[in-house]
Amino acid sequence: MGRENQATIKDVAKRAGVSVASAGRALGNYGKISDETKQKVLAAAEELHYIPNKLAQSMRSHSTKTIAVVVADIQNNFFGAIVAAIEQKARQKGYAVLICNSNEKRELELECLEMLASKQVDGILLASTFTDRKEIPTKYVKTVFEKFPIVTFDRKINGFPFTSVLTDNYAMAYTVTKYLIGLGHDGIATIGSEKEKAVSNTVREREEGYRAALREAGISHDGMCITVDWQKAAETKKRIDILLDYHRITAVIVLNNSIVGEFLKVLDERKMSFPEQISVVTWDDEEHNIYMKMTSVRQPCRKMGELAATSLIEQIESDSPQQEELTITLNQTLVKRESCRINKTY
């Protein structure tokens, strides 16, 4: 049915026997109106299959009741779980959600932000490819980053008074590495996402936590901390093969869930089993990790999404903009299963 055939608020008012102003108050849930009149209007609206004109409402209220989410990699189940939690929480609060994927590319992120700004969203939730204000072109600082309420999640942008909902990647990588050292491993490698390391601090923080634990134990890590682009299968296989061929590796920490599949393929081709020949810890406790009894780092995806959405909506509905940065740090959990064992050479 075209818009011209849809019932208008005048039609609803006529059917209910009230003024247009009263119908507007009843449908918009504002102002003073008796329960009896409100019920008449709502009944009339239902009978006529009335659909509110959101554009007109937003022009009157100066709010679109829409928030945007710019995510770094929608193919990553970690981000997918966060977005699902954001969407659910936003819907509970009466907000619609627009989703944009930057695919870990800064130029695409800026395009997404410019497009979303043109749609006059009320606020933006952002897992950014930028780590500092200085990296962002001035045009976008002025038209987006200083204009809209913004909350970042998983990743922080230094130099802005934003709320950031994060996890302590350094501390968890340190904990994972200490766990493997405690099992007698002294040939511990990491494999991280090349694309993510280029544009965010996540992989770097995990690598730093890993190195700190090894330094503390007096264990070398030369050449055992690599990154790969999982979308380039042949190159990824080559790098992992080199890692396993030229180093005495007894354990591997896979720093990004997007890499796990390619890593396991290489182990399968080399007829290497875990934990018998190599111990493995992965990031993000997904369903296949549980099925394969893989020791994993469980991330608080739902809580991160809910807190990010709640924080943004509170800012949108606040009378004054946020003046100081706020960091909310959530706990990750090491879930120990059967992919690690005591190193027999210990």
Residue ranges of predicted features:
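Alpha-helical recognition/docking segments in bacterial nutrient-uptake
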Residues: 1-8, 62-178, 182, 242-248
